[in-house]
């Protein structure tokens, strides 16, 4: 008599099967400390692309992480000596009709350790919150395993967000799916680059050399932050980028500013005037043709911009800005036009080393961000032509005495190697829709769709050489200080990233 009653009671209540997201979250919660210990080990390795010995230590460590997850990794080398290798692995799914390749990069920006607050770039620590919000170091020696993990804690270290977080989230998502026995619907490939922050100068070489291995229907890119509102976002393009060094000249030796001021030209003034003339008061670039070849946004892209959260006023408050550029356009709109930025400017000395002299030279590094339709070679040529129109004799080396005697204004202009164009994928493609649905399934709020990221990635190199499409799914907190001192990742963003990539690996 008891059994039928129990059966009836059981049938009277709904039975809920765990979703993929719930299973992945269960795995993560059970393995938080092992995952974090593994991540701290990776973050403790210096990872500037020019440091070949340490960059290869990073690659070796990532290979070990892959092996522990049942993958068979290998290094993809370029033919150029001392090039940082890419780390590659794949997982074949029987019967799969689609191949997804997950991209992140393991190198980081150079940094000055003296600029970090109480910590060093490659000595990761937990803080209770962002430094700007009064976050305190949990323990200089690292918290004990018994300490409850607060998802609002942040890990401070170089590349904690950009972009070792991508490596960690992707590999942890794969581990969770495998541990929980969740079937994949696609062949999965992993590609972790080692010199993205150096401009990916050898990515084309690596891709061409290993073209068959890197073939995929879609490259899913993990790099960059979520929207400033905190919502998850899917980004369908990235700006191109190229960097240019500009140097102008005055007297051949430093001159006493009292004896020679008002007579000898000051190169700092010369360069300041030249650079200031390149933009108007609203920040619009005045160089001829700068915007002429921009490819217009389509209806879907314009709708996505209109639907995105309006966050400019809040950003102005956070950043202490009363006035911004752009002539009244939103940040989201301005990301989709080419820009010209001064990365750095130098002439003479300041601070304790300041002297009453007229310097001999002044130098600046310019950052040209490109959008779909721009060509990086054409854009840099426009810059050179503009400098010539301002009366400068342009060369690509140090001037000779004869040139100094002949030309009153001389500018050395050098375009740095590794420039690349912008790329953008249509938002209405079937794979685009599938990615949007997968990411949305893991988010409590409506996700943000961006036609183009403000940051740059070498997506055009990928699409041009492999005839594939790229879609970016960033996971880092927007206030992560990427490229700057005190870089950090909020733990909840890392945890959310694991669930997001698990959803992408199981799209139908």
Question: Predicted segments — roles?
Answer:
Residues 3, 153-168, 261, 265, ...:
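Short, conserved micro-motifs enriched in small and acidic residues
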Residues 4-13:
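Sec-dependent N-terminal signal peptides
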Residues 18-160, 180-184:
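Acidic/His- and Gly-rich active-site-bordering loop/insert found
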Residues 95, 228-229, 291-353, 374-385, ...:
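An extended, acidic, His-containing surface patch that forms the Zn2+-binding/catalytic region
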Residues 147-237, 310:
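Acidic/histidine-rich catalytic neighborhood of metal-dependent amide-processing enzymes
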Residues 165-176, 270-273, 434, 461, ...:
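Short amphipathic alpha-helical face segments that pack within enzyme cores
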Residues 172-179, 273-277, 368, 503-506:
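Short glycine/serine- and small hydrophobic-enriched flexible loop segments
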Residues 204, 212-388:
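Midchain, well-structured core segments that form catalytic/ion-binding scaffolds
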């Amino acid at each position: 008599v008891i059994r039928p009653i129990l059966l009836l009671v059981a049938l009277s209540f709904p039975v809920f099967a765990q979703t993929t997201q719930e299973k992945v979250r269960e795995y993560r919660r059970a393995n938080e400390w092992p995952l974090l210990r593994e991540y701290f080990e990776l973050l403790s390795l210096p990872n500037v692309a020019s440091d070949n010995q340490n960059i290869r230590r990073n690659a070796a460590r990532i290979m070990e992480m892959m092996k522990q997850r049942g993958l068979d990794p290998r290094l993809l080398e370029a033919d150029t000596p001392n090039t940082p290798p890419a780390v590659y692995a794949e997982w074949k799914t029987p019967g799969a009709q689609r191949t997804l390749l997950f991209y992140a990069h393991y190198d980081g920006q150079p940094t000055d350790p003296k600029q970090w607050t109480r910590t060093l770039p490659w000595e990761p620590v937990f803080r209770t919150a962002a430094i700007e919000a009064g976050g305190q170091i949990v323990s200089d020696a690292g918290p004990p395993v018994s300490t409850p993990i607060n998802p609002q804690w942040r890990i401070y270290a170089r590349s904690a967000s950009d972009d070792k977080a991508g490596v960690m989230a992707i590999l942890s998502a794969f581990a969770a799916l495998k541990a929980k026995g969740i079937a994949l619907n696609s062949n999965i490939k992993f590609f972790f680059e080692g010199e993205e922050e150096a401009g990916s100068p050898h990515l084309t070489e690596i891709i061409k050399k290993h073209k068959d291995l890197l073939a995929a229907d879609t490259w899913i890119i993990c790099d960059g932050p979520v929207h400033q509102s905190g919502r998850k976002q899917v980004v369908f393009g990235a700006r191109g980028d190229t960097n240019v060094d500009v140097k102008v000249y005055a007297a051949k030796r430093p001159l006493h500013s009292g004896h020679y001021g008002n007579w000898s030209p000051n190169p700092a003034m010369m360069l300041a005037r030249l650079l200031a003339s390149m933009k108007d008061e609203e920040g619009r670039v005045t160089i001829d043709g700068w915007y002429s070849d921009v490819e217009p946004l389509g209806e879907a892209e314009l709708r996505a911009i209109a639907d995105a959260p309006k966050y400019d006023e809040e950003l102005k408050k956070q950043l202490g800005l009363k006035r911004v550029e752009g002539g009244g356009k939103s940040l989201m709109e301005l990301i989709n036009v080419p820009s010209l930025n001064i990365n750095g400017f130098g002439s003479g000395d300041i601070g304790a080393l300041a002297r009453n002299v007229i310097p001999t030279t002044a130098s600046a590094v310019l950052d040209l961000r490109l959008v779909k339709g721009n060509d990086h070679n054409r854009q840099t040529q426009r810059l050179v032509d503009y400098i010539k129109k301002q009366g400068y004799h342009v060369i690509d080396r140090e001037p000779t005495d004869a040139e100094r005697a002949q030309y009153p204004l001389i500018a050395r202009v050098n375009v740095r190697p590794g420039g690349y164009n912008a790329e953008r994928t249509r938002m209405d493609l079937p794979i685009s829709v599938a990615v949007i649905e997968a990411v949305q399934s893991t988010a409590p709020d409506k996700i943000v769709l961006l036609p183009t990221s403000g940051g740059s990635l070498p997506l055009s190199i990928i699409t041009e050489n492999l005839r594939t499409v790229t879609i970016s799914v960033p996971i880092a907190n927007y206030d992560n200080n990427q490229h700057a001192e005190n870089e950090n990742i909020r733990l909840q963003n890392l945890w959310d990233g694991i669930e997001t990539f698990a959803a992408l690996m199981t799209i139908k």
